[in-house]
Amino acid sequence: MIERSFSGRGPEIKLPAGAIDAHLHVYLSGFPALPGGPGLPEGQPGLSEYRQVMGWLGIHRFVITQGNAHHTNHANLLAALKETRDVARGVAAIDGETSDAELEILKDGGVVGTRIVDLPGGAVGLSQLEEVDARAFAAGWMIAIQFDGSDISDHVDRLSSLRSRWVLDHHGKFLRGVVPDGDEVAMLKRLVDGGRCWFKFAGCYESSFEGGSDYSDVAEVSKVMATHAPERIVWGTNFPHNTATRTTDYPNDAALLDTVLNWFPDDRARHLALVENAEKLYGFQSIAN
């Protein structure tokens, strides 16, 4: 059994007005897990729990990402967006069988992107990258892409050819480790420099060999990227931390926020990641206007 904390002592770093959490999942009652993906997280943390976290951390807007448990069935995502449309956007999981009619329903419901997860349990893998890119580009959507970043050399040419704006999830998710001056990071920099690639700070614990509380190995690469291209970084909580299956593994969201946001070189870079960059990538109205 896992016990999650949704409130507590606030973070030391105060989030700016309009701060956007660019990666979270919610699990509403009545929407079962589908074959091929993981099961639902214990307790099915939903919008009421996430709203507590919003208040705790000072989040103002957010992006609900389709959970792997629901694969390509978007009923849960659309129901959650219906309740939160004024402050939320959605990222779906479309594939070659998704109809044009469903795409219109998703767009009308607040979806602004789709995801590819080329890992066990993912609904749509890199085998469909070009097809998904074509449909996302036509819809004006972004793509969130997740795979073992240690294999980036196998995919860099295809990723460089994408027409859609896209974000590499979870600090690159280098599951076999990475060093800041390695070839993998050099390739990542080139992708970001191409103008259509973003880099997401979220779920650092999923690929860290060093572990908490500082996740120093992931921190080294993330600091390099935040300095190299502060205009291409977004941040997310990764709520409800689905890889944590025991209470002792569940991170304190306020402490984790402070840890990760200290990887930015300065306040301006933090503000870009938390507000302006995410506004551009996910189609939120600019609070500057």
Where are these regions (language model features)?
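A generic "structured core" feature
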Residues: 19-25, 128, 132, 242, ...
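Catalytic pocket-lining loop regions of alpha/beta-barrel enzymes
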Residues: 126-235, 243, 280
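Alpha-helical scaffold segments that flank or form the walls of functional sites
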Residues: 35-84
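Mid-to-C-terminal alpha-helical segments outside catalytic/metal-binding sites
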Residues: 1-18, 44-61, 230-232, 246-289
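Active-site gating/metal-coordination segments in enzymes
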Residues: 1-7, 71-157, 193, 200-207, ...
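Hydrophobic faces of well-ordered beta-strands that scaffold small-molecule active sites
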Residues: 20-24, 62-65, 88-92, 114-116, ...
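Glycine-rich phosphate-binding "P-loop"
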Residues: 33-44, 61-65, 107-124, 247
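Conserved, mostly hydrophobic/aromatic
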Residues: 23, 54, 77, 106, ...
